């Protein structure tokens, strides 16, 4: 059941999701850069039925894991979660962590030190000079801080051995000033609104070539004792998207969620690894949208406005873009739009490969949604202008409902061509 003041939480989640997707690294060999308070509860009638029309339910195969959109860690809607297992490299000493956010708009695995057994000894990453490596993952309004460690990651039947991950820990060394100055700390599950992040976008590493030749402030650090200094870092040592490090099914992923009409208390779908590697991840007639090899973006044209920095981002709780067509809600819900009635809109998505795709979508009144569908975790009509510039169109989780959405990893071969691209 949703708290009546939950739109404060909604706002925070939207901010976080935008941040994760916008501030990742990426670019691989190409270079580039790449979310409560409560005042009681009320009993409400159930929202409209979830219609599983497209995609159809499937048996979960060895290369797939169940995805759930539910109330999660902080009762925030439109957050898709999976469970992952972290193991000390080469051992059976493992910990399974639930409610990990599936984020197609970022790259790399991030978990909390507090959720790992104290006895689990994950080796810390070192750079070529022997520095212990730490990372500041920047968001628009905050950051996560912690060491970079090596772990065996297991999800479904897939495994990535000795994968560099970020272990979020506010007590690791001392947070550098150029990291802390970014904004609020997101170093607990409550402030991150998830138990971690599974970043499975189109790039292999979270900073890519940007961080190789020179130190990038507020990113990677070499630490000695409690002192940490910005350092450059080879791509192979950076926090990594696990998919290209799987033995098979390693060229991308497909996120499949059911159609939702109005709202639903929870929904379940699948995250399938690989594109065209198994019978359950065929590309079929999906439209391949080429993205920039430097930052993973494409172009959206909506109502005559061109948004040159567009992304497909499962880690965002709504569709976020600036427009004069609809008014924003009154404070404190100004992160979202509040049209007088549900708006039926259309847009044209344009890939860097020349592919164009018409998309229809709807935007509801966020204040009305919070009242009508209180307690629901899947809300397909949420959209807003929150913290995006005029060039950004963030196609968040509402876009994913009722679709199979693919993300092809850079430099990996697929039936739709070599990544990076997205498809649906």
Predicted regions and their residues:
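C-terminal motif of bacterial Sec signal peptides marking the signal peptidase cleavage site
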Residues: 19-22
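Signature of the N-terminal lobe/flap region of pepsin-like aspartyl proteases
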Residues: 93-95, 102-176
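Aspartic protease catalytic domain
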Residues: 354-424
């Amino acid at each position: 059941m949703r708290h009546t003041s939950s739109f404060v939480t909604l706002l925070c989640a939207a901010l976080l999701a935008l941040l994760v997707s916008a501030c990742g690294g990426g670019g691989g060999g190409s270079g580039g850069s790449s979310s409560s308070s409560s005042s009681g509860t009320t009993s409400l009638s159930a929202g409209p039925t979830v219609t599983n029309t497209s995609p159809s339910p499937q048996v979960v195969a060895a290369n797939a894991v169940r995805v759930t959109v539910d109330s999660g860690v902080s009762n925030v809607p439109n957050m898709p979660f999976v469970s992952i297992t972290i193991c000390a490299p080469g051992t059976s000493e493992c910990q399974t962590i639930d409610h990990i956010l599936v984020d197609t708009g970022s790259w790399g695995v991030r978990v909390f030190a507090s959720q790992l057994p104290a006895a689990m000894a994950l080796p810390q990453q070192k750079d070529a000079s022997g520095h212990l490596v730490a990372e500041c993952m920047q968001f628009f309004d905050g950051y996560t801080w912690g060491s970079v460690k090596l772990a065996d990651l297991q999800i479904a039947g897939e495994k990535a051995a000795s994968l560099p991950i970020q272990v979020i820990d506010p007590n690791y060394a001392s947070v550098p000033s150029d990291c802390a100055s970014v904004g609020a700390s997101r170093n607990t599950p409550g402030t991150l609104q998830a138990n971690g992040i599974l970043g499975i976008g189109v790039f292999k590493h979270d900073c890519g070539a940007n961080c190789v030749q020179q130190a990038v402030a507020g990113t990677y650090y070499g630490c000695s004792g409690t002192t940490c200094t910005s350092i450059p870092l080879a791509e192979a040592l950076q926090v990594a998207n696990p998919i290209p490090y799987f033995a098979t099914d390693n060229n991308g992923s497909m996120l499949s969620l059911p159609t939702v009409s109005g709202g639903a208390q929870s929904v379940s779908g699948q995250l399938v690894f690989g594109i065209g590697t198994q019978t359950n991840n065929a590309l079929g007639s999906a439209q391949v949208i080429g993205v920039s090899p430097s930052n993973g973006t494409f172009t959206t044209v909506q109502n005559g406005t061109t948004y040159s920095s567009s992304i497909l981002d499962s880690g965002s709780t709504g569709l976020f873009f600036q427009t004069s067509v609809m008014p924003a809600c009154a404070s404190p819900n100004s992160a979202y739009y509040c049209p007088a009635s549900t708006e039926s809109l259309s847009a044209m998505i344009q890939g860097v490969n020349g592919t164009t795709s018409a998309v229809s979508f709807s935007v509801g009144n966020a204040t009305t949604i919070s009242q009508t569908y209180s307690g629901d975790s899947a809300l397909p009509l949420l959209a807003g202008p929150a913290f995006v510039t005029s060039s950004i169109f963030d196609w968040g989780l509402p876009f994913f409902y009722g679709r199979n959405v693919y993300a092809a990893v850079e430099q990996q071969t697929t039936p739709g061509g070599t990544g990076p691209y997205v498809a649906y």
